[in-house]
């Protein structure tokens, strides 16, 4: 197998739990393919640089054939220099007594700076995935601070929600996730997201013909919406490995394409599709080909139930945007 030229992959919050579950898989070729060498450009805050050094030592000790180089830094302009892919994992977690608005503002400062740095030094075709929460609004903040980059280059991760929704449906219908197609997560990566089974199939049969409507509305949707909180309660820590897995899958799909007759959920720049306000980063069903995404057309969202759920999560995203509006260029 002939090797390609190395590509540059930036990861922020690189000494954190999600990154620890992700970096070794990126370096082994799981994200971009077994013929694609990578240079990892790792960003951390100064107090975590020692911890990052330990992670880098471990990466070296794996002797990955595809790992063509490693940069470790606390300077965003160094980390993002010429990068082709940027996974923005690091964010300010919610501390005791912090209101959601405080959290939004603390993260706005981080993602404004990162958006500016990407704008200044990244590849013009950089693909950006925001994992750090609140992911949709953090992606919007970064995008607004990078006026020279195409807004389509900025995405937020709802693939974890998508995967959670697939797993729950497979469990209920006594099938495997391979049997589940055309899952949709609409809206925000938060508890207002709308896991929509209207178009979903299991083994070619419509999902909503196989499950009870009461279960769907009363059990399934809240379970998917609140799965992250359930994991924190059970594990005493937030989901890291499953988030890392979803981030790798999101990027891999964006770069290498979706399966035929299926789609994925991605938080992407709204151009008014399905009546969603333009400029929000909203999760839509998407297909990917040739390194580009497009929103799936023609999903039936005419039911009062769908309209209400899609509007509620859109409203939350609008409120988040308005809370940081004074910080947006």
Swiss-Prot record:
Residues annotated for substrate binding in this entry: 94, 100, 133, 164
Organism superkingdom: Bacteria
Gene Ontology molecular-function annotations: L-malate dehydrogenase (NAD+) activity
Enzyme active site: 189
GO biological process: malate metabolic process; tricarboxylic acid cycle
E.C. designation(s): 1.1.1.37
Enzyme class: oxidoreductase
Residues holding NAD(+): 13-19, 107, 114, 131-133
Catalyzed chemical reaction(s): (S)-malate + NAD(+) = oxaloacetate + NADH + H(+)
Cited InterPro entries: L-lactate/malate_DH, Lactate/malate_DH_C, Lactate/malate_DH_N, Lactate_DH/Glyco_Ohase_4_C, Malate_DH_AS, Malate_DH_type2, NAD(P)-bd_dom_sf
Record keywords: NAD, Oxidoreductase, Tricarboxylic acid cycle
Main function: Catalyzes the reversible oxidation of malate to oxaloacetate.
Similarity-based family: Belongs to the LDH/MDH superfamily. MDH type 2 family.
Protein name, as recorded: Malate dehydrogenase
Source organism: Psychrobacter arcticus (strain DSM 17307 / VKM B-2377 / 273-4)
């Amino acid at each position: 197998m002939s090797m390609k030229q190395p590509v540059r992959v930036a990861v922020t919050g690189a000494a954190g739990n999600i990154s620890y579950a992700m970096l070794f898989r990126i370096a082994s070729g799981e994200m971009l393919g077994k013929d694609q060498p990578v240079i990892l450009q790792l960003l951390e805050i100064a107090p975590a640089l020692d911890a990052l050094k330990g992670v880098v030592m471990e990466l070296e000790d794996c002797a990955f054939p595809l790992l063509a180089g490693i940069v470790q830094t606390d300077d965003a302009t160094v980390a993002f220099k010429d990068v082709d892919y940027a996974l923005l994992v690091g964010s300010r977690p919610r501390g005791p007594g912090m209101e959601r608005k405080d959290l939004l503002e603390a993260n706005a400062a981080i993602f404004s700076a990162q958006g500016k740095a990407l704008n200044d030094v990244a590849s013009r075709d950089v693909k950006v995935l925001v994992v750090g929460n609140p992911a949709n609004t953090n992606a919007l903040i970064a995008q607004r601070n990078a006026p020279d980059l195409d807004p389509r280059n900025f995405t937020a991760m709802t693939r974890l929600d998508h995967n959670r929704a697939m797993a729950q449906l497979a469990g209920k219908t006594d099938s495997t996730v391979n049997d589940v197609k055309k899952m949709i997560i609409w809206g925000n990566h938060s508890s207002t997201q709308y896991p929509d089974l209207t178009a979903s199939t299991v083994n070619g049969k419509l999902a909503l013909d196989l499950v009870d409507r009461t279960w769907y509305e009363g059990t399934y949707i809240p379970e998917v919406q609140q799965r992250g909180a359930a994991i924190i309660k059970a594990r005493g820590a937030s989901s890291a490995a499953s988030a890392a897995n979803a981030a790798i899958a999101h990027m891999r799909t964006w770069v290498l394409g979706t399966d035929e007759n299926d789609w994925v959920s991605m938080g992407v720049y709204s151009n008014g599709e399905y009546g969603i306000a333009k400029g929000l980063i909203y999760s839509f069903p998407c297909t990917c080909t040739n390194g580009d995404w497009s929103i799936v057309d023609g999903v039936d969202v005419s039911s009062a139930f769908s309209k209400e759920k899609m509007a509620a999560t859109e409203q939350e995203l609008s409120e988040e945007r308005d809370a940081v509006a004074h910080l947006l260029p």
